[in-house]
Amino acid sequence: MILKRLILMIAFIGAVILGASISHAAYIAPPSTVGEAVVLIDADTKEILFAKNPDKWMHPASTTKMVTLLTALELKGTQLDELATISSYATSMEESNLGVRVGDQITLEGVLEGMMVASGNDAAVVVAENVSGSVEKFAKDMNRVASKAGAKNSVFLNPHGLTQMGHHSTARDLAMIAAYGMKYQMFRDKVANDYYKVPYQNRTPETIRTTNHFIRNKYPGANGLKTGFTNAAGECLIASATRNGHTMIVVMLNDDNRWDEAVQFLDYGFKLRGVI
């Protein structure tokens, strides 16, 4: 009897030690971040895998253009081959710009592609005016589409993300919007371009390269999304990658180490899901 109890006790202690060892081995520490607000989301399940200040109101800078793209696709997805009208107001935007001119002949799709690759503020205004009639009306459409995508704490007042009082979003909201958009092939196609030849019909097409070094650096599986910077917002990045059919998205707002951290957080997310 004593021997049996001793054997059972040893077996129990061994099981406890083994369980603790397995639990410890399974834990994967998240990366550190200097970002003010960061969210890592599993785009397939919408599960938040890491969050730092996820609901803090932040200046989104040009990550706003992701919402502009999604709104245009939702409202005009079947009419992108129409020629866009270029207003003098659009051409007066502060940099960065695509470089459209009044009188240019270019389709709405061409403007959208150029907006995402060059992060063109002028192109964003062209999109807004041609989709909804004005920047103000388009902003209302942006907020409606963002809400549909799962945003709860965002207010978009312009299509480009230049600093404007009251224009704000959160890392969580931007992650939800990005995950929503990545379900659609047309959206995925337009957030993943490294180069783009702007198809002007009245002048020589111009080849431009993305401002997104995450895409340019060829991270394995990289497929988007958008950069951003203003003095008020700091350096921002929404980065997405897909491996073995599994998509991870990280949102980093006011993060001076955004390029390195994008790689670290996406690697972390894939490791958590057992994806190599």
Give the role of each language-model region:
Residues 3, 25-28, 71, 84-85, ...:
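Intrinsically disordered, low-complexity segments enriched in polar/charged residues with Gly/Pro
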Residues 4, 8, 31, 35, ...:
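Hydrophobic alpha-helical segments and their boundary regions
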Residues 5-6, 66, 247:
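Hydrophobic alpha-helical segments, especially transmembrane helices
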Residues 151-155, 163-276:
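Domain-terminus/edge residues, biased toward the C-terminal soluble/receptor-binding domains
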